Amino acid sequence: MAILKWKLQRSTVREVSIAEPTTYTPAQTTAPTVSACTTEDGVSAPPRKRARGPSTNNTLCVANIRSVDSTINNIVTDNYNKHQRRNNCHSAATPIVQLQGDSNCLKCFRYRLNDKYKHLFELASSTWHWASPEAPHKNAIVTLTYSSEEQRQQFLNSVKIPPTIRHKVGFMSLHLL
């Protein structure tokens, strides 16, 4: 009989207060009731969410504004050579190739490059995207760095880049902190 009473007591549903903590006194024998805002129909209304909108804090912090690249990025063509080269007299720029395309295709291609052509480049970035809504494309980008322009040219001559991946040649100044 005691087991039956215990099972009956455990199987009954009790109302619990969610909106505010309830304190019990030894004299209380009834279960606490739910206290929440109710509408005319007796349905409890959910709590109101915080209104989102533009920030009212319009403080503009301008400190230490300077160019990301501290060098002059002119491309110079001389009369004797028909190819374009960069004026690197005062910069620590490294030659790069940016690969653009579907992120999964770029990841697979980067894996193949690390497996077969590791000697033809220095570093390969992870896939990344421009985070602006005005970004010119939604494709992923992988950046490859080279120790010299000759190494980059050797890479471009010997590696077949898939037609689904576009590439751009350029320079990047790397200032390590």
Curated annotation (Swiss-Prot):
Disulfide bonds: none annotated. GO terms for cellular component: host cell nucleus. The keyword Protein transport does not apply. The keyword Protein transport does not apply. The lineage of its organism: Viruses, Monodnaviria, Shotokuvirae, Cossaviricota, Papovaviricetes. This is Protein E8^E2C. It holds the Pfam family PPV_E2_C. Plays a role in limiting the replication of viral DNA in keratinocytes. Recruits the host NCoR/SMRT complex to viral replication foci to mediate repression of both viral replication and transcription.
